[in-house]
Amino acid sequence: MAAVNTVSSLPCSKAGAAVAGGAPRPSTCSVFYPPRCWSKRSSGNGVRAQASTTETTAAPAAEVTTKVEKVSKKQVDGVVTNKYRPKEPYTGRCLLNTRITGDDAPGETWHMVFSTDGEIPYREGQSIGVIPDGIDKNGKPHKLRLYSIASSAIGDFADSKTVSLCVKRLVYTNDQGEIVKGVCSNFLCDLKPGSDVKITGPVGKEMLMPKDPNATIIMLGTGTGIAPFRSFLWKMFFEEHDDYKFNGLAWLFLGVPTSSTLLYREEFERMKEIAPERFRLDFAVSREQTNAAGEKMYIQTRMAEYKDELWELLKKDNTYVYMCGLKGMEKGIDDIMIDLAAKDGIDWLDYKKQLKKSEQWNVEVY
């Protein structure tokens, strides 16, 4: 049984999780994951050692790609939903919880891993619900909150027995000048390893990955909206499966306020090293970067630099767009596409409806 020690380098505070290996880069730490055992099978997928950051392999031989018939994600066999409901949730255990934003970041974001013992058979792109401990002001149990899953279907430990989340701690001042803390986000960010957590789900089919391994997948994320894309990208570039090998193009646009909030940056940079021809990575750091006109660099501003290329990709029937994060980015992206489509005599809003119908435009915003 093969085993590999995996180190994922994540930006975090100085008080993060245990460090493995040498000294971390400034404002980062390396989260050590237990040895991965690749004799396991998950959902029919045999997974072998692909995530090691220390081994060098020869470039693979050129492969012949074949056209894959488009199959609706929502009709894929084996996708489980609502196995666990609020009245009978699954009780998992917190295995790891570490802050992944820098000390100077505007707010805290945490990466956490929960045990599932294989009882929550989720897919990349699904969500789970979390029911925080305690009762509300009416004396009733807190309602569940949904969170996008941040790990691939086999989990961060590659044993199909864990699920990971990426959660920002919600703290704000209301109109009365009172400090308000989000119930579930603070519950999760304060969890200690060994603590129990009540989980529901999995839920959702909107954000499932396309089955076509030759597809172009454009991912647009802001903040913790990166969660489902981390799950996609781990499957594409850190794992090997008997029935799936990604040969297409993955293009990630990630928008954040500061460089200390570039979540999972070192993981993504490692993926780019592994597959430079198949993975493109563009950051938009609004408080630190500007475009040529001096405008703040939001995600739509960065996309505008590639607008013609993006439009050409969107004309193809094997291009899929996934958007996750703050709702405000939708309008900015529409504004770019309206002008581009008009040059070809196309009404963008009508065209976007067609893309949605063919499951090529997938949105999960809040």
From Swiss-Prot:
| Chain sites annotated for binding NADP(+) | 148, 168, 224, 256-257, 286-287, 296, 325-326, 364
Per UniProt, what is the membrane topology? Peripheral membrane protein
The pathway is: Energy metabolism; photosynthesis
| Entry function | Plays a key role in regulating the relative amounts of cyclic and non-cyclic electron flow to meet the demands of the plant for ATP and reducing power.
Which cofactors does it use? FAD
- The superkingdom of the source organism is Eukaryota
- Its source organism is Oryza sativa subsp. japonica
Q: What protein am I looking at?
A: Ferredoxin--NADP reductase, leaf isozyme 2, chloroplastic
Keywords (A to Z) from UniProt: Chloroplast, Disulfide bond, Electron transport, FAD, Flavoprotein, Membrane, NADP, Oxidoreductase, Phosphoprotein, Photosynthesis, Plastid, Thylakoid, Transit peptide, Transport
Q: List the catalytic activities from the record.
A: 2 reduced [2Fe-2S]-[ferredoxin] + NADP(+) + H(+) = 2 oxidized [2Fe-2S]-[ferredoxin] + NADPH
